[in-house]
Amino acid sequence: MELFWLEHKKLWRKKIVKICVLLCFVYYVIFGSILSFQWFSFGSSDDYTSAFGNNFDGYTVIKDSQGYALSFGGELTDETLQQIVSDYQQMEADGMEEELEKTDWQIVNSWLGTLYPELRDTSNYKTMISYVDPDKLTGFYERRQQVLDEFLEVSGQVGAEKEFLHQIERKVEKPFHYEWVEGWSTLLGSMVADLGVVMALFLGIVLSSLFAGEWHDNTSALVLTTRNGWGKIALAKILTGLAFTVELFALLAVSSVISQLFFMGTAGWDMPIQNIKLIAVAPMNMLQAEIYEYVFVLLGAIGFAGIVMFISAAVKNNVLTLLLSLAVVYGPMMIAEYLPYGMQKALDLIPLAGSSTDIFRTNTFRIFGKLIWSPYLLITIPVLIGILCMPFAIKSWSRRMKA
């Protein structure tokens, strides 16, 4: 334990570590959460040209949007959808531009495009919610089921795989509960989902020198070696890397959740994620989905930390270690679209290379003839990869230093 605390203090004393933590906090919490809520994503539109043209009034807009949605709150039925669309069209006809921003029009419009494609008028430049006849918006859940079946067939997910996904989907409670959806859509679709990508960069910078840096200045390690041995020092470094990973995650996640609670509160936590993407099969509400996404990031970050520390132990150069570490995450992201679908799914199992938003998709893996829903593997395989790398990091570094 003494070795661990010494290594932990040594890591946090480094100026580069403090700078990285500060930059990561500013980028993700200040810009990605607080300013996103207050300005970029939810500030009322001013010039309609960019997020930077928005007014600095996101808190008020969010509260007004939540209040407006409550007038339709409860079960999402055909009548509810018709009322939402009719109310939007009436406000548009009355020229209530500011009031329109408080509606869930983007979400509702996506529902219309998914479930009622035959009502789309290609000659009309307006969005569907502006011109569609509300009385024709019937059979919401029947149409959703039909669209889901068609999607699975087009995706080649038939037979046993289709039935497997239907078994998962049957656990989704219907009718759906409805409140303001747009906030949760932004939160789960980008704010939380992007945390892993952001952490990967700064973890790579900090942890790449954890072992490799000792080749440039190993005086303190040499002193400790006379009493403890390289293996124990290596283990202390591994524990330090893991501790830093968890500490960075906790700082970002807790701060982000506090920001979320301030701006959004807890309203809508029990809505199903199907309100965001209708053909999602996961039987999750918004809160469960958020918890999953944070777990995905934490376990993925631990897995990535294990890989970075292994590379750092095996490579003497800090810069090369950093480049190789970042290539592990960002490389698959850059080449995935050029690869067969099966390889794309395999690359998603690399720590932080996949996406927590897979809970909105219908991806599966077949392992030894057994179908497994992809979100299960996306939170288990990455952390296992990292854990498997750690003993090799200890052995590799100890062997190199002894030599």
Question: Which residue stretches match the model-derived regions?
Answer:
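Junction motif at the cytosolic side of a transmembrane helix
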Residues: 5-7, 11, 310-314, 381-403
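Hydrophobic transmembrane alpha-helix segments characteristic of membrane transport
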Residues: 217-221
